[in-house]
């Protein structure tokens, strides 16, 4: 955005003008997040408004203590390492006791490098096979369903 003289807030507000009507409540995820111990913070390359809009549609707004959006990351997107370090600092996070979930495998490489446990959510649309192949060694877990994965965590199976 800097290279093209575009205001990042304006750009992100335009990019996130989406039809949210296809998103519905995720009751299973809601239940698993209620049970899951510890702070739950969203780290996203999206802006705050888009994130809140999606959380509202999923009925998950009360599940998270905070949101680290692209603006808080100084408009530096994942997988750049500096925002991960900022995230750790801003929220006083112990990386060794933190799990990061992402649906883009390469975003978990720096997460693993700073000490997080990494979980790739294979949503079936990742078409960067080279990124997945080169990221595999950084993925502690893979799942196709975050609710089922959290259910296993909550039961102590993982």
Task: Show which residues each predicted segment covers.
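A short hydrophobic/aromatic micro-motif that marks alpha-helical segments and, especially, helix-coil
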Residues: 9, 20-23, 95
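Exposed alpha-helical structural elements
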Residues: 7-11, 28-32, 148
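A metal-dependent, Asp-based hydrolase signature
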Residues: 1-17
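Short, solvent-exposed polar/charged micro-motifs at secondary-structure junctions
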Residues: 2, 21-23, 151-156
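Short glycine/proline-enriched coil/turn segments at helix->beta-strand junctions
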Residues: 3-7, 36-40, 114-116
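Asp-based, Mg2+/Mn2+-dependent phosphohydrolase catalytic module
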Residues: 34, 47-48, 52-158
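Short, acidic loop-to-helix structural element flanking the phosphoryl-transfer center
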Residues: 15-42, 47-52, 81
């Amino acid at each position: 955005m800097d290279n093209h003289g575009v205001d990042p807030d304006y750009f992100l507000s335009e990019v996130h003008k989406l039809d949210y009507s296809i998103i519905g409540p995720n009751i299973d995820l809601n239940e698993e997040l209620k049970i899951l111990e510890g702070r739950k913070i969203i780290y996203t390359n999206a802006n705050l408004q888009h994130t809140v809009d999606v959380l509202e549609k999923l009925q998950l707004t009360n599940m998270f203590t905070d949101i680290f959006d692209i603006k808080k990351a100084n408009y530096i997107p994942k997988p750049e390492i500096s925002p991960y370090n900022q995230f750790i600092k801003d929220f006083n996070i112990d990386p060794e006791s933190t799990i990061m979930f992402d649906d883009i495998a390469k975003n978990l490489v720096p997460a693993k490098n700073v000490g997080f446990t990494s979980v790739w959510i294979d949503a079936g649309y990742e078409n960067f096979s080279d990124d997945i192949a080169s990221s595999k060694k950084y993925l502690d877990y893979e799942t196709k369903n975050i609710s089922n994965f959290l259910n296993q965590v909550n039961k102590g199976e993982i």
